[in-house]
Amino acid sequence: MTDQIRRAARSVGANISEAWGKRRYEAHFISKLTDADGENHEVEHWLITARRDGYLTDAEFTTLLEQKREVGRMLGSMIHKPESFHLK
């Protein structure tokens, strides 16, 4: 399960990096950020599973889930205001 959480979390960063490299193309930028958001949601799934199966305490789960949600808020802001990130 650790591998799945790590893979999904790393994929969030990889997709953001790819989006940044293509930021001059709004549709591609949004698409890659949307992929990152999907991976971020997968992280939540694995966190819920880890807590359910006893691999995380409630405190650990709460901390990690809040961090995941903060990443989601940042991604949402970037997706909804892509013009703020375009090359001029």
Sequence positions of predicted segments:
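Amphipathic alpha-helical assembly/interaction segments
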Residues: 1-88
